[in-house]
């Protein structure tokens, strides 16, 4: 699989990444929110041992041994969740070298296994998750009920325990406010759309996460195919909206795109929300072939690297808010200059 952030493949039109997440629990332990720190760390050791023969592939990060800032950088890279950080005294995660796989331990469930790849490639992500899940299940007993399927802390994950999602760029549907209808429609068919950091996260930069909401009574194939059908419809709506807006407001759109690029290339201070909004207009310009000398790879990298914790890690310094804005503007200018 290809890491969506750093891939040089330029085929990720509208859909930036695809993710498959499996929720699993061990049969001989209670759920993470009820276990002690000692029990939680025992679970971490138990899962580590299963993958010890795969040491060349995976690295273990124990949150209680990590600097708080480093924890947040992995959140900003979509490798862990805010819930795992809250469980930092007994939480850990395992990832591979190219960071396309992340196995969270003691988040809401004992295991939250996720595989992320670039573009609209849900089947590829599922194959990756399935292979690692099979390896773990060969060595550990999962909590499983013949009628309900995989047992999970939250009832919405019962059954396959599978959550399929895509990160999708919908600037035009946001501009014409059609996105509100999509929000409403998805809820009615058991899907959800939210910010890119999942439940409770704010939508910024016109980037959304679309995923299934229920798993009970559905096979893995049905969950994936249902989501694919919905995402194809959203993609078509976004493309039609782009065609329409270019016919009616061509110069206004071009002005927004080039104005955004101009600000990014010259700003002295940039806050993260403004930066993501401007990057969205530039991405739209690239996707619509208005801008030809900026790569999607650079835009993807900037989407992550301009985040508050990432900026501080890149410059290896604890920064004030104004200092972060200054370094963010500096980083953006440098990356765009080298983008051609």
Curated annotation (Swiss-Prot):
What's the catalysed reaction?
L-arginyl-[protein] + ATP = N(omega)-phospho-L-arginyl-[protein] + ADP + H(+)
Give residues annotated as binding ATP. 17-21, 112, 163-167, 194-199
PROSITE patterns in UniProt: PHOSPHAGEN_KINASE, PHOSPHAGEN_KINASE_C
The GO biological-process annotations, alphabetized, read as: phosphocreatine biosynthetic process
**Keyword Transferase attached:** yes
Family stated for the protein in its record: Belongs to the ATP:guanido phosphotransferase family.
Name of the protein this chain belongs to = Protein-arginine kinase
Kindly state which keywords UniProt assigns to this record, in alphabetical order.
Answer: ATP-binding, Kinase, Nucleotide-binding, Transferase
Identify the EC number(s): 2.7.14.1
Pfam family example for this protein? ATP-gua_Ptrans
Q: Which residues form the Phosphagen kinase C-terminal domain?
A: 14-241
Q: What does this protein do?
A: Catalyzes the specific phosphorylation of arginine residues in proteins.
GO CC annotations, alphabetized: extracellular space
GO MF terms listed in the record are: ATP binding; creatine kinase activity; protein kinase activity
């Amino acid at each position: 699989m290809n890491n969506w952030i750093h891939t040089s493949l330029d085929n990720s039109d509208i859909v930036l990444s695809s993710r498959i997440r499996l929720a699993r629990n061990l049969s001989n332990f209670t759920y993470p929110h009820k276990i002690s720190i000692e029990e939680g760390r025992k679970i971490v050791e138990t899962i580590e041992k299963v993958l010890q023969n795969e040491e060349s592939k995976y690295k273990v990060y124990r949150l209680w041994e990590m600097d708080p800032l480093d924890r947040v950088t992995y959140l900003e890279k979509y490798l862990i969740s805010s819930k795992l950080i809250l469980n930092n005294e007994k939480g850990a995660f395992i990832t591979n070298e190219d960071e396309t796989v992340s196995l969270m331990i003691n988040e809401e469930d004992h295991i939250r296994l996720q595989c992320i790849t670039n573009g609209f490639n849900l089947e590829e992500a599922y194959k990756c998750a399935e292979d690692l899940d099979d390896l773990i299940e060969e060595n550990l007993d999962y909590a499983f009920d013949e009628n309900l399927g995989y047992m999970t802390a939250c009832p919405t994950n019962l059954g396959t325990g599978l959550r399929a999602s895509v990160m999708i760029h919908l600037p035009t549907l946001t501009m014409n406010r059609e996105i509100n209808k999509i929000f409403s429609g998805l809820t009615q068919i058991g899907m959800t759309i939210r910010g890119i950091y999942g439940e409770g996260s704010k939508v910024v930069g016109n980037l959304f996460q679309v995923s299934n909401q229920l798993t009970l009574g559905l096979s893995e194939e049905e969950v994936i195919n249902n989501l694919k059908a919905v995402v194809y419809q959203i993609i078509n709506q976004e493309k039609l909206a782009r065609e329409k807006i270019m016919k009616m407001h061509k110069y206004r759109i071009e002005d927004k795109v080039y104005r955004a690029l101009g600000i990014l290339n010259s700003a002295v201070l940039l806050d993260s929300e403004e930066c993501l909004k401007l990057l969205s207009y530039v991405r739209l310009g690239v996707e619509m072939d208005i801008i030809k000398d900026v790569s999607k790879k650079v835009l993807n990298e900037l989407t992550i690297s301009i985040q508050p914790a990432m900026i501080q890690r890149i410059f290896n310094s604890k920064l004030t808010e104004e200092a972060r804005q200054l370094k963010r503007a500096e980083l953006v200018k440098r990356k765009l200059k080298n983008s051609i």
